[in-house]
Structures are given as structure tokens and as C-alpha cells.
């Protein structure tokens, strides 16, 4: 069974046992999180929510709080002017523990 969840303005297709890197969530390593479920599928026909499904839960456990590799943004004009900026986007790695429909 799989589900499509919404978090951080994005949608992810997950199943039990998956590890997903999502936008940073508040919480400590080992903490529990619940997600909004948009769609559930697997056996037979998929159920689609409007916008979410009532009575369907996806639970996860926070495995890590970390940052992605550095992203460099470099701009150069014809006259010799340059600008270099970079950042590391924080993320939360979550282990999906249960998908209940």
C-alpha cells in the first residue's frame, strides 16, 4: 500500500519503510510526525481526497536533521561585475512507520 502525502508545499509518494528527505520540520531526532494524506492506493482502486482523506493516517519517525550540499549561485555581467552567493538548504529525513487506510 502506498500514499501521497503533502508537507512543505510538496507532495511525496511513500510506503511503509521508506526514508524520505523533506523540507525542515520542527522536532528532535526520534520524534513522531503525522502527515496530510492526499491519495491512498495499492490493492484495487485508489482513493483520492478532496483535498485530504479523513480517517487515513501516515506516521513517521524523524531520523535526521541535516543540510543538503551547498548550492552556489553565480552571476557575471559583461563589465567584470560578479556576484557569488551560496546556501545549504536544511532538511529532515523521515522514516515512514505506518500507513493506515
Swiss-Prot record:
One Pfam family named in its UniProt record: Ribosomal_L21p
SUPFAM superfamilies, A to Z: L21p-like (SSF141091)
Tagged with keyword rRNA-binding: yes
GO cellular component annotations of the record: cytoplasm; ribonucleoprotein complex; ribosome
Annotated GO MF terms: rRNA binding; structural constituent of ribosome
Domain of life where this protein originates: Bacteria
Function: This protein binds to 23S rRNA in the presence of protein L20.
PANTHER family in the record: 50S RIBOSOMAL PROTEIN L21, LARGE RIBOSOMAL SUBUNIT PROTEIN BL21M
Name of the featured protein: Large ribosomal subunit protein bL21
Species whose genome carries this gene: Anaeromyxobacter sp. (strain K)
Amino acid at each position: 500500500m502506498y500514499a501521497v502525502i503533502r508537507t512543505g508545499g510538496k507532495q511525496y509518494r511513500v510506503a511503509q519503510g521508506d526514508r524520505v528527505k523533506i523540507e525542515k520540520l520542527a522536532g528532535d531526532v526520534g520524534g513522531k510526525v503525522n502527515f496530510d494524506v492526499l491519495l491512498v492506493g495499492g490493492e484495487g482502486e485508489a482513493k483520492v481526497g478532496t483535498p485530504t482523506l479523513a480517517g487515513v493516517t501516515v506516521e513517521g519517525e524523524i531520523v535526521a536533521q541535516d543540510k543538503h550540499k551547498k548550492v552556489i549561485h553565480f552571476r557575471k555581467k559583461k563589465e567584470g561585475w560578479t556576484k557569488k552567493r551560496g546556501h545549504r538548504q536544511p532538511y529532515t529525513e523521515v522514516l515512514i512507520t505506518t500507513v493506515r487506510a
